[in-house]
Amino acid sequence: MGRTLAEKVWDAHVVRRADGEPDLLYIDLHLVHEVTSPQAFEALRLAGRPLRRPDLTLATEDHNVPTTNTLAPIADPISAAQVEALRKNCAEFGVRLYPMNDPGQGIVHVVGPQLGLSQPGMTIVCGDSHTSTHGAFGALAFGIGTSQVEHVLATQTLPQSRPKTMAVTVDGDLPAGVTAKDLILAIIARIGTGGGAGHVIEYRGAAVRGLSMEGRMTVCNMSIEAGARAGMIAPDDTTFEYLAGRAHAATGPDWDQAVAYWRTLASDDDAVFDREVVIDAASLTPYVTWGTNPGQAAPLGSLIPAPADYADPAARASVERALTYMGLTAGTPLSEVTVDTVFIGSCTNGRLSDLRAAADVLRGRRVADGVRALVVPGSMQVKAEAEAEGLDEVFRAAGAEWRSAGCSMCLGMNPDTLRPGERSASTSNRNFEGRQGPGGRTHLVSPAVAAATAVTGQLTAPAQL
């Protein structure tokens, strides 16, 4: 019987397999940041263990760093301590670090791909949920906890139970104005936040093939929001063109050999998935979340649902709680929901193509009175590339704030937060209660919808401008 893409990559990395035990996987790339690594490094130090493969370990500062006044000391003592610990640990154990203000610094899931470190057929881990981003390259990439971070630092291996496999096939072409972010929000709304639990999702079909690499990263990034262990897309010419010439990509005969192998990394025709879902791309429109989990999403042109629309008592209760927290009334058109803040950035949508999409909408327009718009590039390289194209001038002319690189308002662990009761349209990945600050209300959207929303002050698709 044939094998799926996930099974091929998994099998190629099994160091030890024994009945009744998890497989021991070799890890090709370990990405590290300041939040989940301090205890792991301290455990190595206390045990007197060296770092097994510093050459396969890369660190960057992203979660806690400010995106303004970056030359000043970090004001929050906990954030400052975590950043300082990362710098100390990387220096002691020989890990390459991209610190704040370094031209290579940025969000870990933006930095890895732009360096060409994320490659097809690899196993990639990080102490961060959205490590699934790298699955866009045909890598098996997933988040791990701090104790697992220690295990990888010490051994370059990780015990893991073999996951199930799931295929999400998106047939046809995405309509004009529908983006990768809309696609993944629609998928999560369809299968639910637990729909991928215990599975590696492989995204397939013409619509997925038509996405750029940055669009594919957006889709794979939010696999965890569907409950999946990881998300993957089989590599193809789009993948190879993106990687060619990057700092850590092979060259010459080594490149040719790598591409020849990468072309074998597709699910076999007779491979059997544990679950399959098919979606018609033509049916999709711009999506937005209305509730407090990414599965509570709907087309922007629809109405906010009512608890009575749900037969399951648990679902009804969840909707009631979400509407109360979000301060919304069932039956209200989503397009009438007003916002205070717009955030464009994150490891989901902080890449150059995302900023271009937002700038295309904002060019020649102004951010609405009373609305604050933050544009935060995913890395210092993205920032430099955007400035070379004049995108920063477009944002500033529109009245938006142009920031330095970092996770920023994706999560309330740095100065960029919502105040209680404030509502945002955000290109990030999670809309949980308090995710962007205590009492903050988050609507997940694409960069284009975020930019259009900034102009009108209410949830808006660009086509409505």
UniProtKB/Swiss-Prot annotation:
Its cofactor is [4Fe-4S] cluster. Residues 416-443 are annotated as: Disordered. Pfam families: Aconitase (PF00330). Keywords: 4Fe-4S, Amino-acid biosynthesis, Branched-chain amino acid biosynthesis, Iron, Iron-sulfur, Leucine biosynthesis, Lyase, Metal-binding. Belongs to the aconitase/IPM isomerase family. LeuC type 1 subfamily. NCBIfam families: leuC, PRK05478.1, PRK12466.1. This is 3-isopropylmalate dehydratase large subunit. It comes from Frankia alni (strain DSM 45986 / CECT 9034 / ACN14a). The gene is leuC.
